[in-house]
């Protein structure tokens, strides 16, 4: 599907989802939370960042788009009978499958209906994206947990995002995998949003700065892309403990070091996302 066709389809689907009426509310900011490999904590980050944003007064929707390994429903203790897979297939609308999650967020689980996201047609991808963009009257931020997937559907989510928050660990392999994910997604399709980096499970600020620096230098040198440091999360034993109890660590241990880092992230991410360059703004207006 050509870009103009995709944009036309998205507007049609969005208009249908709104019942054909006019909606002057700006679309929510869409942030994709991704990792270069499994196990770096994308779901934990996406869930707790959603809660932290809600505590900052930002109406937030969390979408489980990691169809290969959906974990959001379990961590939120909600039913996953219907979800994003049903929206992609046209069986349900986003409004029909949104559920209330912890900490005042809204959650769109993945559901069990999609085993291979590469099977999604361009029309299905645009259907979901259009409905998420139509949540402006109800949401300020939409966070998509895409895990470590870089297939066609995941790449489309990256392209549609206002920002991609790339989660990585401090080890060399994790940083290399994060760079490889950016290269794979961006080599053929430029992103309209920013790329942000989050250093997870770091021992100190120096290690976090090293992670951000290595990733940014590699992307600048070989891809001509800038990666902005969004923050870091220190290793905190309360994080795996809260995950085992199916509870956000931000609510389980609000005074812990990881919670402090997440609260800082909830301030920094909106600042970076909302500070659009003229190029990004121009691109978005053309797309809409």
Give the positions of each predicted feature.
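P-loop/Walker-type NTP enzyme "switch/lid" segment
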Residues: 35, 62-137, 241-248
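Beta-strand-loop-alpha "switch" segments that mediate conformational coupling across diverse proteins
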Residues: 221-250, 262
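NTP-binding/hydrolysis catalytic cores, primarily Walker-type P-loop NTPases
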Residues: 1, 244-288
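Amphipathic alpha-helical transducer elements in NTP-driven molecular machines
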Residues: 81, 91, 95, 125-129, ...
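Conserved catalytic-core segment of NTP-binding enzymes
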Residues: 141-231
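Extreme N-terminal, non-catalytic leader segments
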Residues: 1-39
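Walker A/P-loop phosphate-binding motif and the immediately C-terminal alpha-helix
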Residues: 26-68
């Amino acid at each position: 599907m050509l870009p103009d066709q995709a944009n036309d389809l998205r507007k049609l689907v969005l208009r249908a989802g709104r019942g054909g009426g006019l909606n002057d509310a700006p679309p929510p900011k869409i942030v994709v939370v991704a990792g270069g490999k499994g196990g770096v904590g994308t779901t934990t980050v996406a869930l707790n960042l959603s809660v932290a944003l809600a505590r900052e007064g930002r109406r937030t929707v969390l979408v489980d788009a990691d169809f290969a390994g959906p974990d959001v429903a379990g961590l939120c203790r909600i039913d996953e009978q219907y979800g994003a897979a049903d929206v992609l297939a046209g069986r349900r609308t986003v409004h029909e499958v949104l559920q209330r999650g912890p900490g005042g967020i809204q959650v769109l689980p993945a559901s069990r209906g999609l085993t291979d996201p590469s099977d999604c047609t361009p029309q299905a991808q645009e259907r979901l994206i259009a409905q998420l963009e139509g949540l402006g009257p109800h949401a300020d931020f939409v966070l998509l947990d895409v895990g470590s997937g870089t297939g066609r559907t995941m790449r489309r989510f990256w392209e549609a995002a206002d920002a991609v928050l790339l989660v990585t660990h401090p080890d060399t392999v994790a940083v290399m995998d994060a760079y490889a994910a950016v290269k794979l997604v961006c080599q053929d399709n430029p992103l309209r949003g920013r790329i942000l980096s989050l250093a997870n499970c770091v021992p100190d600020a120096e290690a976090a700065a090293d992670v951000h620096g290595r990733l940014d230098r590699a992307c600048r040198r070989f891809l001509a892309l800038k990666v902005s440091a969004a923050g870091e999360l220190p290793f905190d034993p309360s994080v795996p403990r809260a995950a085992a109890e199916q509870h956000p660590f931000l609510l389980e241990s609000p005074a812990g070091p990881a919670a402090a880092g997440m609260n800082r992230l909830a301030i920094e991410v909106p600042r970076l996302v909302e500070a659009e360059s003229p190029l990004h703004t121009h691109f978005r207006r053309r797309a809409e």
